[in-house]
Amino acid sequence: MARVRPLDTRTNQTRVAVEMFGMDEFLRELRFAPSEVKKAVKQGSKEIADKVVVEMKQRARIVWHQEQYETIVPSLRAVQGTVPKIKIGGARKAAVGRRKRRPSAGELVMGAEFGGRREETTQQFPIHRGRKGYVLFPTIRRLHGTIKKEYTDQIEKVLRKVAR
């Protein structure tokens, strides 16, 4: 199931994660694996995350409030790690010329993804949809099975190489 980790206030970034059953045990064992195995797992994880980022960027182009995603989309990036990771947000400023204090991508992520309009200060965002989201989370939910399958395949491929 997809979930959001808390906003990192130091770097203004949000992490999106997919949880898989049995990952904790695997990651514990991976810490003691040879460095070639760790490197291969990290590269495979980044490849999977890159595919998800491409899908998110495509979906962000067709949503009806795509102007808000123009600031967020360049900050979407895959991060190398033992599991597929995607970072969102950052300090890149929105391209609005009339405001003294322009919002950063990290400040727009949650409003553009989940909506607003319940408070006076969130009228610029689309209608609030609860946990559904508009671009990021629907993409993760749709690709959840693919992510799990590809990650499992990557791990099996690495373990087959080690067993030789």
Residue ranges and their predicted role:
Residues 106:
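Cofactor-/ligand-binding subdomain signature composed of acidic, glycine-rich
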